[in-house]
Design a protein with these regions (language model features):
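Acidic/His-rich structured neighborhood in mature extracellular/periplasmic domains
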Residues: 1-7, 13, 27
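C-terminal soluble interaction/assembly domains
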Residues: 16-121
Length: 121
C-alpha cells in the first residue's frame, strides 16, 4: 500500500517523520501552527499547517538527540499527540505520513507504522 493511493505516493527518498523536541515557547507557537481544516479525516485535521522543514528548524524544534533539524525545503507538518499539557509528544511528519493515513486515517495507526518501520532500518 505504500506505493500510494490516489495522489499520495510514497517517496523512497524521504522518511515518514520523526519525534522532535519542541522549543520552550511551543505553547505560544501552537495557535499560529494549528489552523482549522475543513477537509480531510480527523487525523489529517489534527496536523499543523504545511510548512517547509527549515521553518520548523528556525522555530527551534530539535531532533531527539538535541541536534538541529535538517535545513531542507520539504513539506512538513507538526503533530501533537497526548491527552493533556505536559503529556504531549511532538512529531514532524512528511508527505509519506499522509500516504500512510490514506490507507487508515488514524494518527495512532500512522505513528505505529512509522515507528515500527524505523526499527527495521
Amino acid at each position: 500500500y505504500l506505493q500510494g493511493v490516489g495522489s499520495n505516493k510514497w517517496d523512497p527518498n524521504y522518511t515518514w517523520g520523526r519525534q522532535v523536541i519542541p522549543p520552550e515557547n511551543v505553547k505560544s507557537l501552537e495557535p499560529k501552527l494549528f489552523v482549522k481544516r475543513e477537509k480531510g479525516c480527523l487525523a489529517v485535521k489534527k496536523l499543523s499547517k504545511k510548512l517547509p522543514l527549515n521553518e520548523f528548524r528556525l522555530m527551534n524544534f530539535k531532533k531527539m538527540n538535541g541536534n538541529s533539524l535538517d535545513n531542507l525545503d520539504i513539506n512538513s507538518y507538526l503533530l501533537r499527540m497526548g491527552r493533556e499539557e505536559g503529556d504531549y509528544r511532538y512529531f514532524i511528519v512528511y508527505d509519506n505520513y499522509l500516504n500512510i493515513l490514506s490507507y487508515n486515517c488514524s494518527n495512532y495507526y500512522g505513528l505505529s507504522v512509522g515507528l515500527l518501520s524505523d526499527k527495521f532500518k
